C-alpha cells in the first residue's frame, strides 16, 4: 500500500504535528508499506527535506518529502486552502497514493482520506469553526488523538475512532533512580509553555534547600535568554538533537510543563517513556497524565503550586517510584508500530478489495 501523509502547513515546523507524521511514517515503512509526506511548504533554505526530516525527528528510515510550494515565511490560511483545493488531489494521484492521512484538515479532492483531529481550537474564530465543520464532512473517517480532543471537537465533528499518538519508544533509555542527576527538565521555550513559571518553581525549591537545577530545552529564544541571564541554576539547551534531548530527559528527576495550551502532549509522553515523572498543567489531557498514577497535575499556573508538586517527588521516594513504574507501563500503548497497525486496520475496513 502507498500511503500519503499530509501536513497542511509547513513540514519544517518543530512541533507535535510533524513529530506525529514522522513517527507514523517510519512505522508504516517498518510494516512494509510505501510512504511519502506532502506538505504545503517549508521554512528556510532546506535542501534534501527527507534527510533533514529524518535527522531532526530521530528516525532510522528516510521518508520522501514533497511540498506544494517552496519556502514560505508564514502559514497563510486562505492561500493554503486554495492551494490544497487546486493542487493537493492532483499531487496525491501523481504520487500513486492509495490513501491520504491528513493532519490539519484541508479541502482536498481525493478519496479515500482520513482526517486526524489534533487541536487545540482555542484561537479558532467562529467563521473558521464553520469552515472546519464543512471540511470534515468531506472526509471518509475522522480520528481523534485523545479524549480531550474528542471533547474539544464536539459540535464540529464526531470522531469515528480514538487512536493514540505514535511514539518511538526505542529512542528512550531510562536511567535507574540512583543514577539520575538533580535535574528538573522543562521542554518548550515559547511563551505558551510558560518557562518562567518553571524557573520560579525551581528557584523556590532552591530557597527551600533543595540542590536542584533546571534545564530548559527548546528553540532558541532571545527573550527567555534575557529573562534568566542572572539565574545560574538554569541551563538553556537550544536546538539540541533528539538524542541529546532524550538523554537529558531520561537522566532527570522530573519534568515540569506549566503549559497554557498543549495540543500534543509529546513532552509528557517522552518524559513517561524515560520513566521521568511529569508535573503538568491542566492543558495536558487527563487521559495522558493521570494524577498520582503517571504524573502529577497542577490546576493553576502559580509557581508555588509547581514547586510543591516537584517537592513531593523529591521527598517521597515511594511516590516517585510508583509514578516511574506506572509511566513506563502506560506509555507502551503509544508505541509507534502498534499505533500504525491501528491505522492499517481502519484503512483495511475502508478499502475493500474489488473482485
Go through each PLM region and give its residues.
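Membrane-proximal helix-turn-helix segments that form the acceptor-binding/catalytic region
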Residues: 89, 124-142, 149
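Active-site proximal beta-strand in glycosyltransferases
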Residues: 99-127, 140-143
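Acidic anion/phosphate-binding donor-loop and adjacent secondary structure
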Residues: 125-126, 151-154, 166-181
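Conserved donor-binding/catalytic core segment of Leloir-type glycosyltransferases
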Residues: 175-193, 199-203
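Nucleotide-activated donor-binding/catalytic signature segment of Leloir-type glycosyltransferases, i.e.
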Residues: 224-243
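Aromatic "clamp/platform" in nucleotide-sugar-dependent glycosyltransferases that forms part
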Residues: 260
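Short hydrophobic beta-strand element within catalytic cores of glycosyltransferases
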Residues: 277-280
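Conserved acidic donor-binding segment of nucleotide-sugar-dependent glycosyltransferases
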Residues: 291-292, 296-303, 312-317
Amino acid at each position: 500500500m502507498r500511503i500519503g501523509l499530509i501536513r497542511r502547513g509547513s513540514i519544517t515546523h518543530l512541533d507535535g504535528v510533524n513529530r506525529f507524521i514522522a513517527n507514523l511514517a517510519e512505522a508504516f515503512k517498518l510494516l512494509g508499506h510505501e510512504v511519502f509526506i506532502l506538505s504545503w511548504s517549508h521554512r528556510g533554505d532546506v535542501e534534501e527535506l527527507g534527510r533533514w526530516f529524518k535527522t531532526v525527528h530521530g528516525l532510522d528510515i528516510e521518508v520522501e518529502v514533497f511540498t506544494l510550494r517552496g519556502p514560505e515565511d508564514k502559514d497563510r490560511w486562505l492561500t493554503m486552502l486554495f492551494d490544497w483545493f487546486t493542487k493537493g488531489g492532483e499531487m496525491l494521484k501523481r504520487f500513486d497514493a492509495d490513501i491520504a492521512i491528513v493532519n490539519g484538515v484541508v479541502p482536498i479532492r481525493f478519496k479515500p482520506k482520513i482526517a486526524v483531529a489534533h487541536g487545540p481550537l482555542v484561537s479558532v474564530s467562529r467563521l473558521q469553526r464553520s469552515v472546519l465543520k464543512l471540511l470534515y464532512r468531506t472526509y471518509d473517517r475522522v480520528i481523534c488523538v485523545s479524549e480531550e480532543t474528542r471533547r474539544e471537537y464536539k459540535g464540529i465533528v464526531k470522531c469515528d475512532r480514538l487512536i493514540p499518538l505514535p511514539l518511538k519508544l526505542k529512542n528512550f533509555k531510562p536511567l535507574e533512580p540512583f543514577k539520575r542527576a538533580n535535574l528538573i527538565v522543562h521542554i518548550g521555550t515559547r511563551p505558551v509553555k510558560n518557562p518562567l513559571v518553571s524557573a520560579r518553581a525551581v528557584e523556590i525549591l532552591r530557597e527551600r534547600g533543595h540542590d536542584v537545577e533546571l534545564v530548559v530545552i527548546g528553540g532558541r529564544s532571545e527573550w527567555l535568554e534575557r529573562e534568566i541571564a542572572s539565574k545560574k541554576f538554569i541551563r538553556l539547551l537550544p536546538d539540541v538533537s533528539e538524542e541529546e534531548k532524550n538523554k537529558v530527559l531520561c537522566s532527570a528527576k522530573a519534568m515540569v510543563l506549566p503549559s497554557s495550551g498543549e495540543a500534543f502532549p509529546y513532552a509528557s509522553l517522552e518524559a513517561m517513556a524515560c520513566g521521568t515523572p511529569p508535573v503538568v498543567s491542566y492543558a495536558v489531557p487527563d487521559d495522558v497524565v493521570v494524577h498520582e498514577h503517571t504524573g502529577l497535575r497542577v490546576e493553576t499556573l502559580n509557581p508555588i503550586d509547581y514547586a510543591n508538586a516537584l517537592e513531593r517527588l523529591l521527598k517521597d521516594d515511594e511516590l516517585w517510584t510508583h509514578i516511574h513504574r506506572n509511566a513506563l507501563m502506560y506509555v507502551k500503548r503509544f508505541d509507534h508500530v502498534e499505533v500504525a497497525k491501528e491505522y492499517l486496520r481502519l484503512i483495511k475496513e475502508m478499502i475493500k478489495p474489488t473482485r
